[in-house]
A protein has these predicted regions:
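Residue-level signal for inorganic ion chemistry
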Residues: 43, 96, 183, 218
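Conserved SAM/SAH cofactor-binding pocket of Class I
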Residues: 70-156, 166
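Glycine-rich, phosphate-binding/catalytic loops in enzymes
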Residues: 92, 171-173, 197-198
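Active-site capping/gating segments
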Residues: 134, 184-230
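A short glycine-rich, Lys/Arg-flanked "PGG" loop and its adjoining helix->strand segment in the class I
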Residues: 166-176
Length: 230
């Protein structure tokens, strides 16, 4: 299988400063915006108890975190089963779950090993009726029972360099799931490094929220087989 790399998509010029701009940009109904507003409130409150996100990013919450997460949905609007690895404070998984709450049979699996963050995710899910299942464990533990979980999409944000990320996601990507991973300015270098371990198809979608960032769409993952030497 040959590696294939393409770049598609367009960036949005104006940052999203609040719920009204978010609703306009993503065509979101009022009740969904109310859920995101509640999420924002709980995140601000929770930040005083646990280090959920970088405090300096809170003033740009709607653009830096919410819009950055929501942009992934345009690449898989009909996917019903998602898996967010290293969910942290819920980006991108919890945002997508809130946006898709009214879609039948939708579920977002959130994997997070830190108990305080799991408690926060559960609090937001209750407050917003987000269709999520929280797995408070290490990704490696969940992957041992990977056959019982069959996601359409595997996603992650700021979790690990791509070679390690693909190792973590491999149990699901090798079973046919697509990967949608948010990456920054080093995306190209990470792809080249990952190619030393894996064969895969990769589409680069320019981020809507940052000029030097991308969404990597990865499929057809297979481990590279080293040629035998005589």
């Amino acid at each position: 299988m040959e590696d294939r790399l393409t770049a598609t998509g367009a960036r949005r010029s104006n940052p999203i400063s609040g719920p009204e701009q978010f609703a306009e940009a993503f065509k979101v109904p009022r009740e969904t915006i109310h859920g995101l507003i509640r999420y924002a409130e709980l995140l601000t409150e929770g930040q005083t108890r646990a280090n959920l996100v970088s405090t300096k990013t809170l003033p740009q919450l709607w653009d830096r975190h919410f819009a950055d997460s929501a942009q992934i949905l345009r690449l898989a609007p009909d996917a019903r089963v998602w898996l967010d690895l290293g969910a942290g404070a819920g980006f991108p998984g919890l945002v997508i779950a809130i946006l898709q709450a009214n879609h039948a049979n939708f579920v977002m699996h959130l994997v997070e090993s830190t108990a305080k963050k799991c408690a926060f995710l559960a609090e937001v899910a209750r407050a917003t009726s987000a269709p999520v299942e929280i797995h408070c464990m290490r990704i490696e533990e969940l992957s041992k029972s990977a056959t019982s979980l069959k996601p359409d999409i595997v996603t992650a944000r700021a979790l690990a360099p791509l070679p390690h990320l693909l190792e973590l996601a491999a149990p699901w990507l090798k079973s046919g799931a697509r990967g949608l991973f948010l990456k920054g300015r080093d995306a190209g270098k990470e792809i080249e490094s990952a190619k030393r371990r894996f064969n895969f198809t990769c589409h680069l979608h320019p981020s809507m929220t940052a000029e030097d960032s991308f969404v990597l769409e990865i499929s057809h993952l297979a481990k590279r087989v080293k040629a035998k030497t005589r």
